[in-house]
């Protein structure tokens, strides 16, 4: 894995395209879907919850990025209450691979909304298969890109509205580099002869999103 960075990592402070606002209106949602449909390549995605503050496992924020569309932050609660059709999102991204980190935490919430990835690339699963000693997103990003991500809002109450700018920045950064990571990790999986094994793991995770609902997973080493 030739992209290992031994120098001091630099802190990624903001997404290259700036800090996006939260989309909470149907009109804004339509614009996001149109942009995603016009974009290309894999879809980087993530979700934030408020499990320590509210009962249940609802997603209170969905982050996504696709080449040509930039980063979008969606308020799934407000959009659902306004009558958003999540099939519009599914159709916009089509057969694109969804890049998630620790997909077992995010797929159940996506399934609850009706979001249906057709293909998956999980950077945490890939990191484990590649033998990385630390496989949290911050550690994987540092390993491959020499970049570190701030994690100070990981346990925040994501049901809070309006979301402060630094929270939105944190959320956007979680998907900022996933596309780059997918490209590099796919290369290393092929080189290690583990690409087919990885696809089997991704397919299994994608086919069993509800099975892990409510299970307690140990935190990924950062």
Question: For the regions a protein language model found, what residue spans apply to each?
Answer:
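N-terminal accessory regions of nucleic-acid-interacting proteins
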Residues: 1-43, 47
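Active-site-proximal helix-loop-helix substrate-binding element of RNase H-like nuclease domains
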Residues: 5-22, 63-92, 96-179, 183-186, ...
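Short, flexible, glycine/charge-rich loop motifs used to bind or transfer phosphoryl groups or to couple energy/partner
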Residues: 32-34, 52, 87-89
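Sterically constrained small-residue positions within well-ordered secondary structures
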Residues: 36, 53-55, 114
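A common structural microfeature
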Residues: 40-44, 59-61, 70-71
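An N-terminal structural lobe/cap that precedes and organizes the functional/catalytic core
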Residues: 48-67
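Short, glycine/acidic-rich hinge or "gate" loops at secondary-structure transitions
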Residues: 191-198
């Amino acid at each position: 894995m030739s992209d290992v960075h031994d120098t001091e990592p630099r802190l990624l402070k903001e997404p290259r395209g700036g800090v996006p606002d939260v989309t909470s209106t149907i009109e804004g949602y339509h614009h996001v879907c149109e942009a995603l449909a016009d974009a290309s390549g894999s879809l980087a995605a993530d979700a934030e919850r408020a499990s320590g503050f509210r009962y249940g496992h609802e997603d209170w924020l969905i982050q996504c990025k696709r080449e040509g569309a930039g980063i979008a932050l969606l308020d799934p609660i407000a959009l659902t209450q306004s009558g958003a059709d999540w099939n519009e999102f599914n159709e916009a991204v089509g057969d694109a691979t969804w890049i998630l980190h620790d997909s077992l935490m995010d797929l159940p919430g996506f399934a609850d909304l009706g979001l249906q990835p057709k293909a998956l690339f999980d950077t945490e699963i890939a990191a484990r298969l590649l033998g990385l000693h630390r496989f949290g997103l911050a550690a994987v990003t540092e390993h491959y890109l020499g970049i570190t991500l701030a994690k100070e809002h990981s346990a925040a109450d994501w049901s809070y509205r309006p979301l402060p700018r630094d929270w939105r920045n944190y959320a956007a950064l979680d998907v900022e580099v996933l596309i780059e990571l997918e490209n590099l990790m796919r290369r290393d999986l092929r080189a290690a002869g583990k690409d087919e094994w990885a696809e089997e793991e991704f397919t299994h995770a994608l086919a069993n999103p509800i099975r892990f609902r409510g299970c307690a997973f140990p935190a990924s080493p950062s």
